[in-house]
Amino acid sequence: MANTKSAKKKIKVIRRRTIENKIQKFKMKKAIKEVKKALLAGDIEKAKELYSKAAKLIDQTAAKGVIHKNNASRKKSRLMKLINKYAALSTPQPEKKAQ
């Protein structure tokens, strides 16, 4: 337990910041889930549109120091990789002729 007045104030600040960080992280995770949900539904265009919003939220979360910038980069990279994978599966591939 905090003994000094300044330490008690610091606890209040820490609690407030923790709540703000959790809210920011929740928004980011929700945006990522929406992209994945659109991919599972087979809507590639909607997923790409939602990706731009998710990437923005991921960058904001990293800028606020809630997650590390490398973690943010990894999340965006994996999400884009997943979108590209589903996009490749949905487009028909040209058949190769046997020689």
Curated annotation (Swiss-Prot):
GO biological process: one example: translation
GO CC term (a single one): cytosol
Entry keyword set: Ribonucleoprotein, Ribosomal protein, RNA-binding, rRNA-binding
Any one GO molecular function term: structural constituent of ribosome
Keyword Electron transport in record: no
Highest rank taxon of the organism: Bacteria
Ranges in a coiled coil: none
UniProt cross-references to InterPro entries, sorted A to Z: Ribosomal_bS20 (IPR002583), Ribosomal_bS20_sf (IPR036510)
Pfam families: Ribosomal_S20p
Function: Binds directly to 16S ribosomal RNA.
Family statement: Belongs to the bacterial ribosomal protein bS20 family.
Protein's recorded name: Small ribosomal subunit protein bS20
